[in-house]
């Protein structure tokens, strides 16, 4: 890709700007430019699309997204050391890269939307799950984004796509299964990063379901939190604080079942009975 976009190799960029990855920021820089292109392509067509990227670091994925024709990239980076490297990319693609120095957990993402939006990110490990939940829980649906193509630790990716009776099924699987169609795209080995993480990563692609089962996000969160907080117990016990057997009877669910056996539809039924 260095030849494709005319920019220097990422290793040179990192060395020139002194960008050692900070563990406190959950940073692992992805240096394999073939992989950054693969992530960007997984998102689908990027022409006429604004892409929001969180944690671009030295900009390997940013470069891939711009090279594949995104109308604009809005990159949110809290590490000020990375800003000069990103500014060089912005100079190479005039008017197509907006850089915001901020904590992604504090950003109003919907306000950044300018026409169709795709979120593409190698998310910092320490905030990735919380950001995903934030993007899934707005009151209005469909959301401001057309799709999300995100990298997580593989264990988190498995939780995102898990369904009932899967060992990885939990609150995240219910939430993602309720409002999105989610799939695992491909794995990324530790050696693709600097420094190499101790675990394999995976890219997950999510698209919003146009008309999910009507249900209050806050109440669904409350039900899944109670049910999976004691996942090995029968529902009559784990849901006791929310009404226990009376709630389950109202929803038509056997009180002897356990949380991991319930479908997304059944969790929504419980939430709607509260």
UniProtKB/Swiss-Prot annotation:
It is found in: Cytoplasm. CDD domains: AdoMet_MTases (cd02440). It catalyses: adenosine(1518)/adenosine(1519) in 16S rRNA + 4 S-adenosyl-L-methionine = N(6)-dimethyladenosine(1518)/N(6)-dimethyladenosine(1519) in 16S rRNA + 4 S-adenosyl-L-homocysteine + 4 H(+). It comes from the Bacteria. InterPro entries: KsgA/Erm (IPR001737), rRNA_Ade_diMease-like_C (IPR023165), rRNA_Ade_Mease_Trfase_CS (IPR020596), rRNA_Ade_methylase_Trfase_N (IPR020598), rRNA_adenine_dimethylase (IPR011530), SAM-dependent_MTases_sf (IPR029063). SUPFAM superfamilies: S-adenosyl-L-methionine-dependent methyltransferases (SSF53335). Its EC number is 2.1.1.182. Keywords: Cytoplasm, Methyltransferase, RNA-binding, rRNA processing, S-adenosyl-L-methionine, Transferase. Belongs to the class I-like SAM-binding methyltransferase superfamily. rRNA adenine N(6)-methyltransferase family. RsmA subfamily. This is Ribosomal RNA small subunit methyltransferase A. It comes from Rhizobium meliloti (strain 1021).
